[in-house]
């Protein structure tokens, strides 16, 4: 699937050739001026004088694409590029448009315990073995706030948070299948 391509950052040769051709075509299109278009179309300029002039830019589209692909493991693609917190509705991932803005620097107490979770998260992001984590304690001790703050803190490094309700636990295997090929790293928060 598409996620595999993003994760591997390689394409089969036939698709790579098609991609190169499309990027070259789009590169030409980006540099096309209205005057060049009118000349090629052999249309008298006065007939299309109402068309606005547009500016072109010196953009190296293949290089921009390669740069974006090199960052996909941190920035994501599609909805994962725009959002970093998700919930599950009817078996589908849905972005949380206004996630809790909690920051680690705003959380008092439990630094020692929180540091263990942060170290585990760093291991996950580095592609090293990471553990499942169970946070427990009295209500109001910052368990949920810590998870949300970690998600906010590490979103620029490719971390995404998926909030799963208790009555949705049966959907976790399907979620894992959907997320497995994604180059980002995910915390499932129950």
Name each model feature, range by range.
Residues 2-6:
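Short, small-residue-biased leader/transition segments that mark boundaries at the very start
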Residues 7-50:
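Phosphate/adenylate-binding glycine loop and adjacent helical scaffold
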Residues 38-95:
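Interdomain "pre-motor" coupling segment immediately N-terminal to P-loop NTPase/helicase cores
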Residues 95-115:
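Dynamic helix-loop-helix/coil hinge segments at AAA+ ATPase domain boundaries and subdomain interfaces
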Residues 96-98, 122-130:
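Phosphate-binding P-loop
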Residues 112-126:
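Pre-Walker A adenine-sensing motif
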Residues 132-162:
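Walker A/P-loop
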Residues 152-185:
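AAA+/P-loop NTPase substrate/partner-engagement loops
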């Amino acid at each position: 699937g598409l996620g595999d391509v993003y994760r591997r950052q390689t394409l089969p040769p036939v698709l790579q050739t098609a991609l190169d051709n499309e990027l070259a075509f789009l590169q030409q299109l980006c540099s096309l001026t209205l005057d060049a278009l009118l000349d090629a179309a052999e249309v008298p300029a006065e007939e299309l004088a109402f068309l606005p002039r547009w500016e072109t830019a010196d953009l190296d589209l293949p290089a921009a694409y390669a740069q974006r692909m090199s960052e996909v493991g941190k920035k994501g693609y599609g909805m994962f590029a725009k959002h970093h917190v998700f919930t599950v509705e009817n078996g589908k991932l849905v972005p949380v448009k206004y996630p809790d803005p909690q920051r680690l620097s705003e959380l008092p107490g439990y630094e020692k315990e929180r540091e263990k979770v942060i170290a585990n998260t760093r291991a996950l992001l580095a592609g090293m073995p990471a553990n499942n984590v169970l946070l427990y304690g009295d209500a109001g001790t910052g368990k949920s706030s810590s998870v949300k703050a970690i998600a906010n803190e590490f979103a620029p490094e490719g971390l995404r948070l998926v909030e799963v309700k208790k009555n949705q636990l049966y959907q976790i295997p399907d979620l894992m299948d959907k997320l497995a090929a994604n180059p980002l790293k995910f915390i499932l928060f129950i």
